[in-house]
Amino acid sequence: FEQGFDAAVELTALGIRPSLLDLTEDEDGIRLHLLFEGYREGVAADVQRVKQICVQTGGQDIGPGPTMEYWRDRRQSAVRYKAEALGRPRKVRWSRWGGRNFDYLHMALPVSKVLDYRKRCDLIMAGTGVKVAEYSLWSRPELFSMMLRPDTGDGVRFRANLAEVVEQVLTLAQDMGGIMEYCHGVGVKLNHLLARELGVSHDVIRDLKQTLDPVNIMNPGKLGL
């Protein structure tokens, strides 16, 4: 993962912007998916330089097959959502998550802190029954995601400790100069941590909210207000 991260940092620093950049470490191994689009000569130049970078950082070219398969299948979660939840009553949509044995966290951190953050998260989870089943970077090296699953088959222990583990890794991201959620938004789940993340900016948001909505009828309870 560290080698793929170094490659992502280098190509980003050079101004190379792949249409797809996905570095994933899971039970199947570690792969950096890259896909480019644009005019032929520009794409050829990007591909040539990126291959050099990946080899220099310890990578191996396994050909276009795995990335093309990934690209074809990337919509599956959206297809399932459309079939199972879209247009359904809220109770039906929410019941899909009942008793789920995973969580997906999406933090943004300074590039220089990402690898150290990963190591410190592993220490937080040690002995809790919670493990990282997938580490990933999407689009940019500072956008770091982790899928959390039970360390063993003990789902009860996992669920008992999950909230505390999530709280610790998210506040660690904040303490290291990052943010706790870059992908799906804060929602109500992370409401209680928003003031901690925004600092005095949260006071400004509160003042604006009170001025525009003095009786608090617009999305009450959101944004930690």
Short names for language-model regions:
Residues 187-225:
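Activity-critical C-terminal alpha-helical subdomain
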Residues 177-183:
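Basic polyanion-binding and macromolecular-assembly surfaces
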Residues 146, 169, 184, 208, ...:
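Hydrophobic, well-ordered secondary-structure elements that form the walls
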Residues 64-65, 183, 220:
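Conserved beta-strand termini and adjacent loop/short-helix elements that scaffold enzyme active sites
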Residues 3-168, 172, 176, 187:
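C-terminal substrate-recognition/cap domain of FAD-linked oxidoreductases
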